[in-house]
Amino acid sequence: MAKAPMRVAVTGAAGQIGYALLFRIAAGEMLGKDQPVILQLLEIPDEKAQKALKGVMMEIEDCAFPLLAGMEAHADPMTAFKDVDVALLVGARPRGPGMERKDLLSANAQIFTAQGKALNAVASRNVKVLVVGNPANTNAYIAMKSAPDLPRENFTAMLRLDHNRALSQIAAKTGKPVSSIEKLFVWGNHSPTMYADYRYATIDGQSVKDMINDPVWNNDVFLPTVGKRGAAIIEARGLSSAASAANAAIDHVRDWVLGSNGKIVTMGIPSNGDYEIPQDVMFGFPVTTANGKYEVVKGFEVDAYSREKINITLKELEEERAGVQHLLG
């Protein structure tokens, strides 16, 4: 028997990431090749943006995706989020020239407060929310705090792009395929302060740390390369990383919904106090996923170097959180 369609909301649907994302969702890459989807697409109520969204929808129609059971354009989150099972919050105020992340906080706080309230009011009670729009961790925190009737664990932030970037750098360094790397993960904020940790990673049972055996490379090359990759792509391409961000969003939701098959992945989730991260901080953790739920992988020892790195990214997140607290009422 055919499965009932799942409703997927995507905000900023006519943007670069939306364009790289929607066709793949409609093709079944995120929720499974047997899972029909209804796309509920949100753009700002600006005539140009709504017109662009219509154009994207025309293209999606022209793909004749067998799994696409419906598609709607919206300008209001209260209608866009009606009964949604998955919400990808991609749209955010972009960073302009000379703007710091801090400048983005208040502009985005308004957007994500409104979207959190709308999800609280009209989404499925089991909605899975992934925030992609930056600053992703704090935007996810704002949305979560604005949706008191939804379980807090339903709100997540995207660290999977950092995770995937780290995987590809380790693969290049070791000359091994990406698929052979296990137990690599990322702590903290989706920002240059994130801490990609391969101390426990293995390739075919061998320790990656022992294979590389180069703390200077780790500190001076690997971590800055992963942390500043987004800026390097803007520098090279003149546009921000859209296709790789869309790909990471698909990976994140696919694993959350369908399970990671025992593999450790990275998700930004509200802390329960694990690894001494204060309650409710939206933080990248090593997790495994099964049956639509994620679980923090406990028991990794945090050495002095790692604790220092984790504290730096935690401090940044706590500063961001303090910067929006007054906006949350």
Swiss-Prot record:
Pfam families: Ldh_1_C, Ldh_1_N. Coiled coil: none annotated. One of its GO terms (molecular function) is L-malate dehydrogenase (NAD+) activity. The active site is at H190. Gene3D superfamilies: Lactate dehydrogenase/glycoside hydrolase, family 4, C-terminal, NAD(P)-binding Rossmann-like Domain. The keyword rRNA processing does not apply. Keywords: NAD, Oxidoreductase, Tricarboxylic acid cycle. Disulfide bonds: none annotated. It catalyses: (S)-malate + NAD(+) = oxaloacetate + NADH + H(+). NAD(+) binds at G12, A13, A14, G15, Q16, I17, G18, N108, Q115, V132, G133, N134. Signal peptide: none annotated. It comes from the Bacteria. GO terms for biological process: malate metabolic process; tricarboxylic acid cycle. Catalyzes the reversible oxidation of malate to oxaloacetate. This is Malate dehydrogenase. It comes from Ralstonia nicotianae (strain ATCC BAA-1114 / GMI1000).
